[in-house]
């Protein structure tokens, strides 16, 4: 990738996308903070605010990473790699709007229990993703790219903890949007994340000496002792 192409597609466009996502979270926070201020015992509102703040921290950090990170040592740009990476990164964010557009049978479950469970899962997922990002830092990328190997923190337990956090958050989202359509989207999202790990690790093994040994030392991609 040339310098101009990297500037446009590796910095400006993805950075702008995550700045937009951060801006949306800030706008959504204002009325939710007002609700929590007026009713400090509203656990649903408080957990939703925590969820928003964690997601805001995550997307803000990603936006900054895209501005300052270096070009990759190696990357894959094939259509399948691009499509899977984009789908896994953004499909859950588009679940509600797409369901409305195609008139899918998705109804919001507003019961206090569903909202609480949803927010706990969302908070857990975003917290894990943000914690993992603090270790991955400027090596983060949506597309399959190799910059440096990270083995500390959550990467001692699994090789793709950010994706695990996103999957946990995905379950949290679907709890309040439960339908056959949302379940199908969630299953396809998890499948895309799994396939994404195979594509990325092919790049990392090829570009980074020692990554093959790290895979042997840390044998699980997403869940310790399972997969």
Regions found by a protein language model. Name each.
Residues 165, 171-172:
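Alpha-helical membrane segments in multi-pass integral membrane proteins
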Residues 1-143, 172-227:
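Membrane-anchoring alpha-helices and their flanking helix-loop junctions
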Residues 147-165:
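Solvent-exposed interhelical
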């Amino acid at each position: 990738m040339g310098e101009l192409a990297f500037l446009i597609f590796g910095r400006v466009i993805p950075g702008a996308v995550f700045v937009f996502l951060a801006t949306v979270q800030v706008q959504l926070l204002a009325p939710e903070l007002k609700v929590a201020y007026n009713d400090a015992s509203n656990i649903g509102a408080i957990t939703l605010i925590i969820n928003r703040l964690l997601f805001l921290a995550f997307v803000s950090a990603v936006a900054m990473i895209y501005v300052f990170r270096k070009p990759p040592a190696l990357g894959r740009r094939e259509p399948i790699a691009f499509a899977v990476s984009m789908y896994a990164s953004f499909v859950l964010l588009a679940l509600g709007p797409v369901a409305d557009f195609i008139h899918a049978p998705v109804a919001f479950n507003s019961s206090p229990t569903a909202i609480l469970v949803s927010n706990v899962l969302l908070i857990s997922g975003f917290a894990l993703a943000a914690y993992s990002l603090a270790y991955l830092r400027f090596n983060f990328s949506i597309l399959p790219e190799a910059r440096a190997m990270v083995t500390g923190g959550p990467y001692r337990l699994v090789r793709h903890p950010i994706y695990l956090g996103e999957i946990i958050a995905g379950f949290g989202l679907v709890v309040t949007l439960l339908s056959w359509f949302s379940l199908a989207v969630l299953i396809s999202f998890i499948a895309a994340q799994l396939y994404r790990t195979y594509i990325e690790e092919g790049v990392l093994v090829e570009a980074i000496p020692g990554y093959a040994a790290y895979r042997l030392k840390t044998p699980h991609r997403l869940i310790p002792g399972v997969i």
